[in-house]
């Protein structure tokens, strides 16, 4: 059976390596390892049943429930009080006692899912092209059998087959229609893992979907690059990615140092591979894939024509005529020029420069990388430079950081986790309930995790490598990851300051003041000139540089734009800090908050909604916007924005009492009602209304929402896993594993706490 290993435990077994380094004892790291001797016959039979059940219902319920982790944690034998289920009949009203009973059931169960290091592990997945990238990187470097056991491969294949759509194709993500992106990459992955087309109906259907939709020549840009790397698509069929762009003067808006960090880091290694025109080993399997992905013989394909071809299922953001001119010029004139003397010397210099940056990124993220995409790319680049180098070998044990196992199989996470981000919210959720005394042990462990996950140092020579300040910040995941995130820093700061108000006898010693000052200094450094906050760094360039985005799949990826959610989280952290430490950088903080509030108000749409970029979508945006405005001193009476926001939310409440927003809201930028209540959407809307003072105006919508949440609560005390609510670039949807529990707990806790307070 498989076992989940946490923190220092994860340094052994499959993750064991003298090349595996950490800065804080692997805090937050979660690795699945296979133990052939583990488990009783009954436990193994239960795992098999859960897997069969998922496969049987996979087209009706695409989201896994993370049941294998829950099985393991249940076996640990945590003692739980015998709390009976809360049942509210249709003709009954919710009472304070009902809410409190529901809360206790939820928190008692949820506390048992906390890891010993203080965070809550879970399945942070949902994007279907990430595992193929990791498999491709292991294939071309010859390490597939070194890193992955037969059990790994079996579970990865299970996952890919489970998430094949009924039409035979695969989507870009678990949610949504089949695309050439998802289909080509997952088909090739199955082949590389040893699956054969002969007598394999699933592979045959996948191939049929690909061929009937234009073949792999109609794949989008990112897919074409990866297919080129493994040798089943020719590099001449790609839009040029010029390595020399990194050599232009830094002050120019088009220098990649000014791009959003994800695009900068991903295209950095893509540019290296393009400049090298690197192709992995041409094995018999690769030759088979060449035959199976196209309607005509591989040798007869017109690669230049294929360059601009993209299937309609993948063509989300067509190139403009200006972009067409740019890429034609780069492909026809610029790239060929750098392949002949004397300009090829500049290409060699450019490639060496890129490798210098790639090595720096790897070393300063403990070989985790910013994300699994640039990690997989960097790993290949390091192997090309020297297959025997530590720089390459250190990548291998960190692959496990991205693998997660559930009843639907083994999948790749979208990051190395969201440990810090979710733990900060969980702390705030538990504190909102007023039940701190009962769950002080849970809070104490979470407190320790957050305190010990702070980034303590700036990166050496960071400016030369385009990196922002990091000292005092928190990352999305672990300190080892190393990439500072403004909103994660803001929310964690807020959680820590809330805990500092509680007796140390209950939750442990407070964080040091110096650490708080470092956090505030770092937060203020993230502020744009207009007081707004972007996702990772300050906005560094103008929106017109989006003409350099060659991707048909993703929009607005060149610039790190400011966002309502990021801005709200950042200023809430600053506001919480000034309440306790009013004398530290007060003038700067006040100015920042003033400008940030203006930004949030100005981003409100005519119908009273706020667009949420990092979650689904308008309920998510409203929660952060209203919460941020309230923290800054606005209220329902003095803020038209808050009144309009509340009116918008109330207009979307379903007759049953909850809210249900479909993920397509993010794509079309209009609220799309899913028709059924979603626990997370309901909780976010409920919290926004609570913060605005809805309980004093008319508590009826809140009682209806609370009744809906309680009716959704499972027998275990948890809330159901429903449609994914994480979003990236308005086009990729994935799962935040703890949202399903933390937000309902927060909403019910805040409601109960305010009901009690209103009667005192």
Swiss-Prot record:
It is found in: Membrane. It comes from the Eukaryota. CDD domains: SQCY_1. InterPro entries: SQ_cyclase_C (IPR032696), SQ_cyclase_N (IPR032697), Squalene_cyclase (IPR018333), Terpene_synthase_CS (IPR002365), Terpenoid_cyclase/PrenylTrfase (IPR008930). The active site is at residue 487. It catalyses: (S)-2,3-epoxysqualene = achilleol B. Keywords: Isomerase, Membrane, Repeat, Transmembrane, Transmembrane helix. Pfam families: SQHop_cyclase_C (PF13243), SQHop_cyclase_N (PF13249). GO terms for biological process: triterpenoid biosynthetic process. It is a single-pass membrane protein. One of its GO terms (molecular function) is intramolecular transferase activity. It is an enzyme of class 5 (isomerase). Its EC number is 5.4.99.48. Specifically mediates the conversion of oxidosqualene ((3S)-2,3-epoxy-2,3-dihydrosqualene) to achilleol B. Achilleol B is probably formed by cleavage of the 8-14 and 9-10 bonds of (3S)-2,3-epoxy-2,3-dihydrosqualene as part of the cyclization reaction, after formation of the oleanane skeleton. NCBIfam families: squalene_cyclas. Belongs to the terpene cyclase/mutase family. This is Achilleol B synthase. It comes from Oryza sativa subsp. japonica.
């Amino acid at each position: 059976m498989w076992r989940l290993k946490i923190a220092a435990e994860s340094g052994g077994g499959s993750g064991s390596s003298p090349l595996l380094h950490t800065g804080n004892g692997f805090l937050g790291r979660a690795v699945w390892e296979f133990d052939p001797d583990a488990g009783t016959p009954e436990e193994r039979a239960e795992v098999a049943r859960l897997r069969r059940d998922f496969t049987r219902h996979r087209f009706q319920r695409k989201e896994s429930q993370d049941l294998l982790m829950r099985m393991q944690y249940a076996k640990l034998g945590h003692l739980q009080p015998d709390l009976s289920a809360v049942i509210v009949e249709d003709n009954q009203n919710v009472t304070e006692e009902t809410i409190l009973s529901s809360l206790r059931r939820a928190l008692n169960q949820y506390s048992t899912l906390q890891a010993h290091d203080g965070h809550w592990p879970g399945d942070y997945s949902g994007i279907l092209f990430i595992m193929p990238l990791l498999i491709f990187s292991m294939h071309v470097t010859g390490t597939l059998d070194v890193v992955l056991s037969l059990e790994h491969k079996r579970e990865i294949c299970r996952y890919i087959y489970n998430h094949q759509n009924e039409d035979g194709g695969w989507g870009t993500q678990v949610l949504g229609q089949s695309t050439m992106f998802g289909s080509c990459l997952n088909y090739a992955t199955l082949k590389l893992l040893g699956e054969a087309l002969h007598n394999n109906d699933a592979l045959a259907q996948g191939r049929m979907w690909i061929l009937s939709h234009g073949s792999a020549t109609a794949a989008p840009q990112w897919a074409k690059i990866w297919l080129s790397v493994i040798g089943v698509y020719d590099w001449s069929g790609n839009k040029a990615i010029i390595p020399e762009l990194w050599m232009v003067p830094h002050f120019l808006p088009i220098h990649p140092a000014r791009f959003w960090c994800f695009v900068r880091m991903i295209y950095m290694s893509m540019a290296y591979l393009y400049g090298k025109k690197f192709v992995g080993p041409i094995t018999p399997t690769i030759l088979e894939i060449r035959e199976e992905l196209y309607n005509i013989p591989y040798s007869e394909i017109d690669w230049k024509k294929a360059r601009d071809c993209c299937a309609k299922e993948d063509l989300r953001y067509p190139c403009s005529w200006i972009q067409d001119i740019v890429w034609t010029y780069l492909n026809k004139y610029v790239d060929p020029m750098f392949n002949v003397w004397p300009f090829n010397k500049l290409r060699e210099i450019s490639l060496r420069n890129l490798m210098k940056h790639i090595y720096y990124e790897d070393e300063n993220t403990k070989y985790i990388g910013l994300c699994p995409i640039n990690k997989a790319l960097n790993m290949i680049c390091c192997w090309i430079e020297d297959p025997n180098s530590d720089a390459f070998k250190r990548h291998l044990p960190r692959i496990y950081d991205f693998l997660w196992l559930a009843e639907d199989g083994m999948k790749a996470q979208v990051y190395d986790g969201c440990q810090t981000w979710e733990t900060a919210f969980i702390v705030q959720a538990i504190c909102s309930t007023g039940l701190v005394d009962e769950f002080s042990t849970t809070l104490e462990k979470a407190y320790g995790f957050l305190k010990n996950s702070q980034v303590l140092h700036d990166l050496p020579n960071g400016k030369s490598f385009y990196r922002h300040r990091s000292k005092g910040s928190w990352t999305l995941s672990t300190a080892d990851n190393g990439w500072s995130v403004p909103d994660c820093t803001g929310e964690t700061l807020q959680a820590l300051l809330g805990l500092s108000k509680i007796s140390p006898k209950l939750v442990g010693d407070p964080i040091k003041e110096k650490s708080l000052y470092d956090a505030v200094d770092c937060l203020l450094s993230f502020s744009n000139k207009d007081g707004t906050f972007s996702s990772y760094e300050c906005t560094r360039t103008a929106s017109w540089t989006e003409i350099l985005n060659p991707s048909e799949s993703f929009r607005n990826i060149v610039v790190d734009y400011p966002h309502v959610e990021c801005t709200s989280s950042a200023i809430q952290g600053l506001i919480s800090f000034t309440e306790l430490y009013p004398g530290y950088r007060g003038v700067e903080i006040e100015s920042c908050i003033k400008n940030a509030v203006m930004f949030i108000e100005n981003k409100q749409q005519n119908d009273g909604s706020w667009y949420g970029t990092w979650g689904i979508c308008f309920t998510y945006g409203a929660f952060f916007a209203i919460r941020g405005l309230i923290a800054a001193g606005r209220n329902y009476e003095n803020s038209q924005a808050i009144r309009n926001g509340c009116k918008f939310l109330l207009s979307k409440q379903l007759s049953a009492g909850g809210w249900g927003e479909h993920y397509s809201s993010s794509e079309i930028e209009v609220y799309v009602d899913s028709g059924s209540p979603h626990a997370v959407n309901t909780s976010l809307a409920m919290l926004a209304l609570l913060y605005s003072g809805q309980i004093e105006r008319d508590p009826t919508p809140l009682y209806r929402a609370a009744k809906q949440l309680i009716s959704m609560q499972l027998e275990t005390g948890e809330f159901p896993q429903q449609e994914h609510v994480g979003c990236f670039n308005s086009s990729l949807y994935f799962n935040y594993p703890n949202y399903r529990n933390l937000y309902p707990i927060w909403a019910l806790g805040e409601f109960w706490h305010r009901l009690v307070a209103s009667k005192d």
